[in-house]
Amino acid sequence: MTRKRITRHPVLDVGPQEEVTFSWNNKTLYGKPGEMISSALFANNIQIFGHHPRDNAPQGMFCANGQCSQCLVIADGVPVKSCMTPLKEGMVVESVEGVPRVPRVDAPPDKGFDVLEKEVPVLIIGAGPAGLSAALELGKAGVETLLIDDKDEAGGKLVLQTHKFFGSVEDSHAGTRGFAIGNLLDEELKAFDCVETWLDTTAVGVFSDKIVGVVKNGSYITIKPEKLLVATGAREKMLPFPGNTLPGVYGAGAFQTLVNRDLVKASERVLIVGGGNVGIIAGYHAIQAGIEVAAVVEGLAEVGGYKVHADKLERLGVPIHTSHTVVSANGTHRVESVTVAELDSNWKPVPGTEKTFVVDTLLIAVGLSEVNEFYLKAKQWGMDVYCAGDAEEIAEASAAMFSGRIQGLKIAKSLGRFDGEIPKSLEEKAEVLKSRPGKPVKREAPEGETGVMPVFHCFQEIPCNPCTSVCEEELIHTEEDTITGLPYAVDVEKCKGCMNCVAVCPGLAVTLVDYRKDPEFPTVTLPYELGREGVEKGSVVTLTDVDGNTVHPSPSRGNHTVKRVVANKKRFPGTLMVQVVVEKEKAKQVIGIRIQKEETAMGTDPDPAGLADDAVICRCERGTLGEIRSAIRDGVRDINQLKGINRAGMGSCGSKTCRPMLWKIFRDEGIALEEVTDRVDRPLFVEVPLGVLAGVKGENGDE
């Protein structure tokens, strides 16, 4: 069986790994101890985890974050979410074919077992950037705090990010890679004995007696906090289209989990729908992992993410199709191709513009929804509850850090442990970091063709200025000295060519042009984060401008070849400075190296698989767009009634994925949303084995 592990990565450490054996449908396979079952299956090129009882549709990964139930498998006789269940030596794993059988339990319930109860001044749910930052402020104030997270390491989505972060160096570790920021925050927190962290601990409900129920190591525990902070992050949104639940269609965050956290080569060729930062960054991460990106498709006329992120992809040879959408994912058992089409002014696909890409994976990156059910229920029960990060408002992780700090200080102040005023600068910086990117502007290249000088290829105001902090001569500033101002250099004759600005830039948008040795053919230093292969000294490279257009060499000079590769592994790990000699008239245009071939598509496909009404809305119960539309047109205005008619939203995930789409369907049908009754949310918010609540002991004495 083919093994799909990432064995070499330009940023992440890929060292030797211990292996364990497990079985999948009676076949012996190998995995890493402690990795999630889903990742072990993907690493063994298995993406179909079972078949749905309603229509025998193949089931596989979608969220990789415990938010849906599509990755269900049977592990040692018990149905579990494969993305949340660690692999063990000798584990027997089976696909779920239809309705999972009820596991045999020989041990009787412990009628007298005691539920552990714990009272704490502060409970924080979620150890991502917001939760960690809040805990740090509470730790500094000496507030006894319990921080819990359902993963086996702190950091939240920071763990998945290999790119360098934006913001400022002093406030949000700008220029440092996301996973390293998570480690920094976690290490800082260990200095405070008053903060206790429980990992592998899942909050499952908030109750009317102001108790938060959690499951830790198979045991049910009740926690009664004076103050509750919900920092649970976000979950990925989905799109309705035929084939949208085929194995191979999953969220961009799930892809980053597989590729960056678990070092699984989850795909050979992907197509991405969604041109926000999440989708564009996922495309870059794919290329770092050796995965081809066929294209990025965005419904708007312009990408919603930072232009420097989009520019990085286009320079590498990835086409970005704006005003396009996905029409269908095609395949019998898994994704074999994806059909896209151009959108008209009414957001309808234009007939005849269909284009089909042969890919094995379709990444969905069409936005995020707040994981705020714990916050809303706590408010309903009158708890003193706070909210931070994406659970409060979807924004960048750097903004979540500020949000967490602010809420941490508010909680400390409410407990009388902080008597100062919360700095207004925190709120102001948080708002800046949440702000939308500005409109791209045209900028002229700097004048002069002597000495050595930086060239800034960023044309859009975004909150980012690490280049101003690393210049040894303090020559780099931003317009109006604001974090969103475009950078520029002064007194460039003083530049010594240290290359720090090239290496630190999160957008890889700074080059250095050195005329000192040969003014006619200066040396251009380019940032590069894809490893040394293909850019070794003497390698022939295809250079590109900011828009991804090829910068051709002059016929008299021949090919562009790499002159030298420089690395500062200690200060800027993972970033290479590739030096190439370029004609002076082109030197300030050059910014990238193309590694992918020109776009290849199958052409038009006027008959994509399936009809729009076949799109699955409710993954758990396989409720389709057509069934839900029919009920709405028959007069249904209550989502609870929809559950009774066609089971939409009735599944074990608690409508986490389908709920936003249900509201959109009502809106698309012309129904005023104030006329629609929302579903009633009840505990539990997360699936919990009955044995945990009954005190049933397993074979090894665990709950």
Residue locations for each model-derived region?
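Acidic (E/D-rich), amphipathic helical modules within compact regulatory domains
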Residues: 455-458, 462, 466-512
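Well-ordered secondary-structure scaffolds
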Residues: 441, 445, 449-450, 454-459, ...
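Residues forming the flavin
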Residues: 2-27, 32-455, 459, 470, ...
